[in-house]
Regions:
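Transmembrane-helix signature of polytopic, membrane-embedded enzymes
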Residues: 137-138, 159-181
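Interfacial juxtamembrane loops and adjacent helix segments
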Residues: 34-140
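Membrane-interface alpha helices of multi-pass inner-membrane proteins
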Residues: 221-237, 241-248
Length: 516
């Protein structure tokens, strides 16, 4: 992830991520201790004019160092990849768009951002990295690096928690599938949604480790559960919900009695974990109700009006699922990684979940089924209500915002398969880790290539764009494509190494045996 992510950081033009300039302003402010800012009104250039009423409630202004500040909270390449990203190589006003005069590079400047009221948690590290740079372009890239390193740390922790030396062929399959190209991309641009995804992933992985270890759960695992759960809760407004879903999954997998016994066996460390998660949820509520005000819905509308949009969102489910795999840049008009990536990744996740449902015990199958049903129901409900009540229009939600929820059933399915794969005996490929690693690596590489092509020649340009490139990243395309290739080979290599890993030597259990 570090190799491919590093390539993404540089290959992505400055700026190009969804709402990235607005998030960058927020990160700069948080890093210098400005958490709330001054209320302000958004300009009429807001990308979704129908939701200006909401943005006016979330817009704040901050006093920032002029040398690091962007020219505005917009981007010249937002929502339109019919042309290359060559405008990002122009003067500051062209790059950031909406500038009326060349921005000053000395002293301080006051800028507004429509992302001004969101929790400061996931802005701090990117902002601190940005303050080490010498200008706005390098500042944004440094902030991206801070976001990537945070994600790498959380995903590494999740991998260590999920790793089982006795079942090395299967223990990381869920994690491999949860880190979609979109998960990786969102952690290489400045956007707290990326950190929200991996925080949810890390907390869910910790709870699955508790399920595996039961009453023998170690002190470090309980500490990790408290830390990651608290982080998940205070990252974004939906964080407490993601934490609650993950916790409910653990109780469902263990059963109420076993869950209580596990908590009692954990003693004060289990109490710390529970207290930390609850404290995180309370802090998040305090932020929205005491520090800033929860944005009010559009006047004249209520949640029931969203029912009219249910069929619209339900009909767009396939597109929303695709948006959790690819769909880079600002929306609408985002960059697709192509049908192969969406179909291949979707097929791999479906296969993983199907195998888990086949081998899982009754309770495990119920938990997976409930998680999938809740994921779909929440997607439709949230999209329908947001479309009307908040004025987002269309489906009311985009795929990347749903990834913090979707990673939970994927990880649960991976752990269920790891624990029960012997029930299928020879029907489960012993090289399954390699079978999934090869197309996963290919999808990650293709995703970056398709984004690079849009940046270089636009969406309508030639697929093999290197000789026709109108925009190039620093040092050209070659080093970043080589680094991406090395990262993809590392994924394949990891899958190959797991093929030869040991198993627990368990005797195959017939599928007719079905105990809770």
């Amino acid at each position: 992830m570090l190799l491919i992510g590093s390539a993404w950081i540089v290959v992505n033009p400055v700026p190009s991520g969804p709402d990235e300039p607005a998030h960058y302003i927020r990160a700069l402010a948080v890093a210098q201790g400005e958490f709330t800012g001054t209320p302000a009104l958004i300009s009429t250039q807001s990308p979704p004019p129908e939701s200006t009423y909401i943005w006016n409630q979330t817009t704040r202004s901050f006093l920032l160092p002029a040398s690091l500040a962007p020219g505005s909270m917009y981007a010249c390449d937002a929502q339109d990849w019919s042309e290359s990203a060559k405008c990002t190589s122009g003067p500051a006003c062209a790059r950031w768009a909406a500038c009326l005069a060349t921005p000053s590079t000395s002293g301080d400047v006051r800028l507004t951002t429509y992302e001004g009221v969101y929790e400061p948690t996931f802005y701090l590290i990117p902002g601190l990295f940005a303050h080490l740079a010498n200008d706005s372009v390098n500042g944004l890239r440094a902030a991206r690096l801070g976001q990537l390193l945070t994600a790498v740390a959380l995903i590494t922790a999740a991998g260590l928690l999920l790793w089982d030396e006795r079942q090395s062929r299967f223990s990381l399959l869920g994690l491999l599938m949860a880190v979609t190209p979109m998960t990786l991309y969102m952690n290489t641009v400045v956007n707290p949604v990326g950190a929200e995804i991996v925080a949810s992933l890390a907390f869910a992985a910790t709870l699955l480790r508790i399920w595996r270890d039961g009453t023998g759960t170690s002190k470090l695992t309980w500490i990790a559960a408290g830390a990651f759960g608290c982080l998940c809760c205070i990252g974004r407004i939906e964080g407490p919900l993601w934490a609650a879903v993950a916790a409910a999954s653990l109780v469902g997998l263990l059963g109420p009695r076993e869950a209580l016994a596990t908590l009692r066996a954990g003693g004060r460390w289990a109490a710390f974990a529970v207290a930390a998660v609850v404290a995180g949820a309370l802090l998040d509520e305090a932020w929205w109700h005491l520090v800033v005000s929860v944005p009010a819905s559009l006047p004249g509308y209520g949640a029931l009006d969203g029912l009219s949009k249910v069929t619209t969102v339900a009909g767009a489910l396939v597109g929303l699922l695709e948006g959790q795999i690819s769909g880079f840049g600002w929306d609408p008009g985002w960059i697709s990684a192509g049908p192969f990536v969406s179909l291949a990744w979707g097929f791999m996740v479906t296969s993983l979940v199907t195998l888990a449902l086949l081998v899982g015990r009754r309770r495990e199958r119920i938990v997976i089924a409930l998680l999938l049903c809740f994921d779909i129901a929440y997607t439709v409900g949230d999209g329908a209500v947001s479309s009307v009540v908040l004025g987002w229009g269309s489906t009311g939600v985009v795929g990347r915002l749903l990834l913090p929820l979707s990673v939970i059933p994927i990880l649960v399915a991976g752990e269920v398969l790891c624990r029960n794969h012997e029930r299928l005996r020879e029907l489960v490929p012993q090289r399954l880790s390699l079978v999934l690693a090869v197309p996963a690596a290919l999808c990650q590489g293709i995703a970056l290539w398709m984004a690079a092509r849009a940046y270089a020649v636009g969406l309508d340009g030639p697929l093999f764009f290197l000789r026709h490139s109108q925009w190039r990243p620093p040092f050209g395309w070659s080093p970043w494509l080589v680094i991406t290739t090395l990262g993809c080979l590392a994924i394949v290599g990891a899958g190959w190494l797991q093929v030869g890993g040991p198993t627990d030597g368990a005797v195959a259990v017939p599928l007719v045996v079905d105990t809770p």
